[in-house]
Swiss-Prot record:
One of its GO terms (molecular function) is carboxy-lyase activity. It comes from the Bacteria. Coiled coil: none annotated. One of its GO terms (cellular component) is cytoplasm. This is Uncharacterized protein CCA_00454. InterPro entries: HBDC (IPR022390), UbiD (IPR002830), UbiD-like_C (IPR049381), UbiD-like_N (IPR049383), UbiD_Rift_dom (IPR048304). NCBIfam families: mena_SCO4490, UbiD family decarboxylase. Belongs to the UbiD family. It comes from Chlamydia caviae (strain ATCC VR-813 / DSM 19441 / 03DC25 / GPIC) (Chlamydophila caviae). It holds the Pfam family UbiD_N.
Length: 581
């Protein structure tokens, strides 16, 4: 179904009992997000809240809360569409063959924007700018305020005019000011930097849209010179209608519920945060640019789209998977040494990436690894797992086992200190600063991996288990652990990888839990420990085990958790929200 129309999508999901209308009064401060979290945890339907306290507009959440629903929403996109494009680009057809590719060529004609000359603009202007009229959510008890959680932030480069549509959370500061949480390696932040270099404000337009293709495109890691609007229109198969406005150089998209027009203020910063983010922890308060809102448009029957982020699985996980499904065929074209590539949403995407690569000559895998770490937002990858063995990247235990049976640590373990880091990842010494590691397992297997620890007792270890062959998980505490004693323990030398955790049962409950608890809680430069006997040719002679200290450190932000008052309130009112269920 072509579900760029939010109202048609809502009607269809309602008819399939995959959307529930909630008419009970609900507070956008903590209560609504807690309802949402319980529903998405149980793979439940989309939610349309009609009676949000203090607001004139209904709130839609959990639109992307299951993989099945995401697949249905984007089912108009033909399977194999991107591979067809790649084939067409790599082998341009002869004139006589164009008819065979007519559907793809017609889709190409749908790219971009179309000025709506005869369509009435479906929005009206808010009498005066008042951001308090929007039902912004406070999702977690220690959040610094209410946030736009699905804003589509449109900017243009002051020099080239190349546009960017990105998704950056926006905290409400007052009736006409929002924060601009521009993260590194994102286009909006690049444009703001350009504007400040010229001592100018940056025109910014914020769309709140229920068009799934716009939302998906806004989170796509596209090259800086490719517009997200092109991807949106290519996937949905139709142009986006727009009109001009005298108060902004930007197009106003008809496919929006709300449109906020304003600018990022040059050289002005406001304390932004904390905010419980998609890593599952609070991102802390830092100074970020401010957006001054000059005008607000909204549909007469506007629906406010929102999402809640936190520990996986949330809506961003399912959207991220769909996006990787579409974009993964492009990786071998952009990076010829790559066969497959996947970033793991269970670890916040940027914390962990796996790749199957080619090894057509000695250490081609290293060249490809560096190519991956130099490619756009992939440059924020913290751990990169590489093999040339054909393995299903969706099966992370198998990928890790494949690498551990092949890795030669003094050759295939590479650590980079003093690198950039995802803005939301606090494992490094400062904001946006961190480190990286590459694990490579190339060629045939060279060892049999242990499945169970059979050695002597380990100092200050209270429990242990295996995640996969070759990976031993040890339960301990930060206060008790003795890293050197573990590295030098003779009975651990046969284990390529050892992981430290506070709670073994929680960590080994599932692959999702292992990924989240392991890779969101360590920095390679400070928390990856390994022995080496000497340094030769500027390389340490590493020996097993490689130890990952994934214990919570004192400087890490807290995990996001709902407060007890809200938990009890939602439990008490549950039948009010869902009287028919």
């Amino acid at each position: 179904m072509a579900m760029s129309s939010l109202r048609r999508l809502v009607s269809l999901l309602r008819s399939q009992n995959d959307l529930i209308d909630i008419f009970a009064p609900v507070d956008p401060y903590l209560e609504l997000p807690e309802i949402h979290r319980r529903v998405i945890e149980n793979q439940g339907p989309a939610l349309l809240f009609h009676n949000v306290q203090g607001a004139s507009f209904p709130v839609l959440t959990n639109l992307f809360g299951t993989q099945k629903r995401v697949d249905q929403i984007f089912s108009k996109v033909p399977k194999g569409l991107i591979p067809q494009v790649i084939h067409l680009l790599s082998s341009p057809p002869k004139l006589s063959q164009l008819w065979k590719h007519r559907n793809l060529l017609l889709r190409g004609l749908s790219l971009g924007l179309r000025k709506a000359r005869f369509l009435k603009f479906p929005h009206k202007k808010m009498a005066s700018v008042d951001l308090h009229q929007l039902p912004m959510l406070t999702s977690w008890p220690e959040d610094g305020g209410a946030f736009l959680t699905l804003p589509l932030v449109y900017t243009e480069s002051p020099s080239s005019k190349i546009p960017n549509l990105g998704m950056y959370r926006m905290q409400r500061f007052d009736r006409d000011t929002l924060g601009l949480h521009f993260q590194i390696q994102k286009g909006g932040g690049m444009h703001f930097y350009e504007a400040e270099q010229k001592n100018e404000n940056l025109p910014v337009t914020v769309f709140l849209s229920g068009n799934p293709f716009l939302i998906l495109s806004a989170i796509a890691p596209l090259p800086e010179n490719i517009s997200e609007l092109l991807l949106c229109t290519f996937l949905q198969g139709s142009k986006l209608h727009y009109k001009n406005d005298p108060d902004t150089p930007h197009p106003l998209l008809y496919d929006s519920e709300f449109i906020l027009i304003g600018e990022g203020i040059c050289n002005e910063r406001r304390p932004e945060g904390p905010f419980g983010d998609h890593f599952g922890y609070y991102s802390l308060q830092h100074d970020f640019p401010a957006f001054k809102c000059r005008k607000i448009y909204h549909r007469k029957d506007a629906i406010y789209p929102a999402t809640i982020v936190g520990k996986p699985y949330q809506e961003d996980f399912y959207l991220g998977n769909k996006l990787q499904e579409y974009l993964s065929p492009l990786f071998p074209m952009v990076m010829p040494g790559v066969r497959q590539l996947k970033s793991y949403g269970e670890a916040g995407f940027h914390a962990l990436t796996g790749a199957v690569v080619k090894e057509r000559y000695w250490k081609e895998s290293l060249a490809t690894s560096l190519r991956i770490l130099g490619e756009g937002q992939l440059s924020l990858t913290k751990f990169l797992m590489i093999t040339d063995h054909h393995v299903d990247l969706d099966n992370f235990p198998k990928l890790l086992e494949t690498i551990l049976s092949r890795i030669v640590p003094e050759r295939d373990l590479i650590i980079f200190s003093e690198t950039s880091n995802d803005t939301l990842d606090y494992t490094g010494p400062k904001l946006n600063k961190g480190s990286k590691a590459i694990f490579m397992g190339i060629g045939p297997a060279i060892r049999d991996l242990p499945h169970k620890y059979r050695g002597k007792s380990l100092p200050n270890i209270t429990n242990m288990g295996t995640f996969c062959p070759g990976c031993l998980v040890l339960e301990t505490t930060l206060q008790q652990v003795n890293i050197d004693a573990l590295l030098n323990h003779p009975d651990l030398s046969s284990w390529p990888l050892v992981v430290l955790t506070e709670n073994l049962n929680e960590t080994l409950a599932s692959s999702k839990d292992f990924l989240w608890k392991t890779f969101t809680r360590l920095a390679p430069a400070t928390d990856l420990h390994v022995r080496f006997s000497n340094v030769a040719h500027h390389r340490p002679n590493y020996t097993f085990p490689i130890l990952l200290n994934s214990l919570m450190k004192p400087h890490y932000p807290k995990e996001v958790e709902a407060d007890e008052t809200t938990i009890q309130k939602v439990s008490h009112r549950w039948n009010e929200y869902f009287p028919k269920y």
